[in-house]
Amino acid sequence: MNSRLAHFPSNAAAREQSSSYVVLGVMLDRLTLPALPVLRGKRVILRGSGESDIDDRLRHPIDPEEEDGYGSSWRREWDGRRYHTREYLTAARQPADSSAYTWAVEYDGHCIGSAGLRVDVDQHCATYAVGLFVAALRGQGLGREVTSLVASWGFDVLGLHRIQLEVLAGNSRAIRCYLACGFRHEGVRREAELYPDGWKDFILMGLLQPEYATGAPRSRLPDRGGPKAR
């Protein structure tokens, strides 16, 4: 499964200003963003990236399903598996955008993928993405557990009103996962990216806090410790 983060502007400057503002006569409080937490589920742990995660990544070749999820822009810019992975892990451990959270997905003591949440502190919304690079572990409900953990933290701890994502229209496994977690189909970006076999559509999906509160699956809340790395 794979979904991707949209590009929100950094909110670092916004957090240095007033903690509230007015939109069309409505007073809103800017979200306060804590440090990256450790989120623990029944089978997976979401944590900060560690140097040894690069070895876990390199044990598993990039397969077509994973590559499709990254999109055509990633394929154009990719310059070697180790370079890309090390660059990604460095960015994840020391993000330039302080409104972006990136977790390594740990299962059975090894990193098997990553999940991300990019937050708009003014609009109380975030864009979510997840990818598992171990093909044999897809389809076992791990992506659903990761998604539920991040949604629980986003709504219950951050105080988000909305979480959104986009996914390749042909990725039926990922779409089923998101639907099971309460996300709703909101639209289509038609022929949004060019792939080797033609233009591809992307499905837009979203989950609102009231929908989550009345029926979306919940996972155990994260512990209060800081990010950990192996």
Region locations from a protein language model:
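GNAT-family acyltransferases
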Residues: R4-F8, E16-A136, W199-K200, L204-R230
